[in-house]
Amino acid sequence: MLLTKEKNGMEIIEERESAVRSYSRSFPTVFEKAKDHLVWDVDGKEYIDFFAGAGSLNYGHNNEKMKTKIMDYVMNDGISHSLDMGTVARAEFLETFNEVILRPRNLDYKVMFPGPTGTNTVESALKIARKVTGRQNIISFTNAFHGMTLGSLSISGNSSIRNGAGVPLTNTISMPYDTFFKNGNAIDYLEQYLEDTGSGVDLPAAMILETVQGEGGINAASFEWLRGIEKLCRRYDILLIIDDVQAGCGRTGTFFSFEPAGIQPDIVCLSKSIGGYGLPLAITLIKPEHDIWEPGEHNGTFRGNNMAIVAATEALSYWKTDDLAKSVQKKSKIIKLRFEQIVEDYPELKATTRGRGFMQGIACGKGKEAYATKICAKAFEKGVIMETSGPSGEVVKFLGALTIDETSLIKGLGILEEATEEVVRQ
C-alpha cells in the first residue's frame, strides 16, 4: 500500500474526505483486511466485528463460497454491467429466490431491481403504492429510518436526518410505533385517526414500517401489533410495506423478519445482505396484482450489478436448510442472556434490553444516554466494533455476522462487558 509513516491514512482521510464522513470518526483507524467476523487494521490489530457493515455482511467478510463464485464469474468474463437486460446471473437468481425463499413460504411476489441501495427499494415501494391506489399520503412510524433520498427522508423519524433534506417533506404522516407509548394502545390510536374524517389524516396509499427499527433504537414490534397493522391495512384498503433492508435476510432468525407474525405484506424492501458479499444490490418484492409499472417507468443505471447477483444467488444456499436459522436462534439466546446480565450488573446505566435475533441492543436510560457512545468507544479500543442507535445514540447495538462461531461471539461479548465496567467505574 502507499501509506508510510510520513503519510498516515487517517490524516489523508481527514484532509481529503468530506466532513460528512461518520464511521471513520467512530472507528478512527485504517482497516486493511477482513475475514468472516474479524477485521484487521494497517497496524495488524484484530477486531471482532459486531457491526457487519450496518447489516450488509450477514454472512461475514469475504465469505469463501461467495468469493469463489464471484472470482469464477469474473475470470470467465461474465457480464458485469447490464442495466436490466437479461443475463444468466439474473435468471439464476430469480429462479433460486423463488424456489428457496418464496415458494416454501407460500409467498407470491414479482421481483423488481430498483437500483443498488436500500433507499432505492424504498423509493420504488412508495411510487408503486401511490400508483396502485391513486392516493398520495403515506403513514410511517415514530423513530423510523428508511434512507437518505427525499422520499425516504419524508418517512423517517429522526429530525436531524430529516432536516438534511433542505426542503419541505410532504405527503406523509408519522404515527406511534408499537413501543412508543408506555401506556396505551398504538393500534387503537391509529385506527381513531383513520376512522375520524375530522382527524386531518388523509386515507393513505400505504403504511411502511420496520419490524425491528435498526437506526431508531432497536425497537422490536410485537407480533400482535404487526398483525393489527395488517388488519387495519386490509380493512381500509391500504397497502402494507415492510422495510426489511436491515432486519431481513436472516438477521432476526428467519429470512424475512415478519415471518413469525404470520403476515403477508403487499410490498417488501430488501437490500444490504441480499447481495450476500457486501456488494450493492436491492430488490423490491411486489404482489403480482400491484405490479402495474409501465416498462421503464422506474429505472436506473446500476440495476444489473451481476457480480452482486452472483453472490446473492450463492447466499441463498444458506436457506436451503434450516441450519443457519437454528444457529442464529441459538446464538441469539446467548446474546440476550449476556445483555440482560450486563443490565443487571450495572444498574448505573438504568438500562433495558431490546430487539430480537442478531439485532439486539442495550438501551441506556434517561439521563444516561451518553454511556452508550462511551461504551462503544471503549469496546473499539479493546478490539470490538459496535455502533450506537436511537434518537439520542442511547443504544449499544449488536449487528454481528450470522455466521460467527459461538466462541468468538462469547469472546466479543466478554470484551463488551469489560468495556462497560471500565466506563461505568471510571
From Swiss-Prot:
EC code: 2.6.1.76
List, in alphabetical order, the Gene Ontology terms for molecular function in this entry.
diaminobutyrate-2-oxoglutarate transaminase activity; diaminobutyrate-pyruvate transaminase activity; pyridoxal phosphate binding
Q: In which pathway does it act?
A: Amine and polyamine biosynthesis; ectoine biosynthesis; L-ectoine from L-aspartate 4-semialdehyde: step 1/3
Q: Which example biological process does GO assign this protein?
A: ectoine biosynthetic process
Q: Residue positions of the PTM N6-(pyridoxal phosphate)lysine? A: K272
The record's section on SUPFAM superfamilies has: PLP-dependent transferases (SSF53383)
Tell what triggers its expression. By osmotic stress.
Cofactor(s) for this UniProt protein: pyridoxal 5'-phosphate
Tell me the NCBIfam families matching this sequence.
dat (TIGR00709), ectoine_ectB (TIGR02407), PRK09264.1 (NF006733)
Protein family per UniProt: Belongs to the class-III pyridoxal-phosphate-dependent aminotransferase family.
Instruction: Tell me the protein's name.
Output: Diaminobutyrate--2-oxoglutarate transaminase
**From what organism does this protein derive?**
Sporosarcina pasteurii
